């Protein structure tokens, strides 16, 4: 997955990305800035891979902003001309381990 994250980072560095409507709506509600999404991707790592997702191959990236805010970014694979940011959110310790890279199983899931 090293090559995959490098390709994603290159798309971000080259400004070759776009946001889904869902990503725009949720980032406003969650008060996540475009800058923070960029920082999380550029500093992050792929923690979940969805190669067979029904809307196209995608992955979940966990990273920190310059202010040390943890952010998860769900994005498409970089095969398309513009990388699609599907959604972003700030993970919580109720659902993730202390470095926000592994889900915690709950009885509800």
Question: Where are the model-predicted features located?
Answer:
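Ribonuclease/tRNase effector modules and their secretory precursors
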Residues: 1-109
């Amino acid at each position: 997955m090293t090559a995959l994250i490098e390709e994603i980072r290159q798309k971000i560095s080259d400004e070759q990305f776009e946001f889904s409507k869902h990503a725009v709506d949720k980032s406003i509600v969650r008060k996540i800035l475009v800058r923070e999404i960029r920082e999380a991707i550029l500093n992050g790592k792929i923690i979940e891979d969805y190669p067979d997702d029904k809307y196209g191959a995608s992955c979940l990236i966990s990273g920190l902003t310059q202010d040390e805010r943890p952010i998860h970014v769900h994005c498409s694979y970089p095969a398309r001309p513009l990388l699609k940011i599907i959604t972003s959110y700030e993970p919580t310790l109720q659902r993730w381990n202390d470095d926000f890279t592994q889900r915690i199983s709950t009885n509800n899931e």
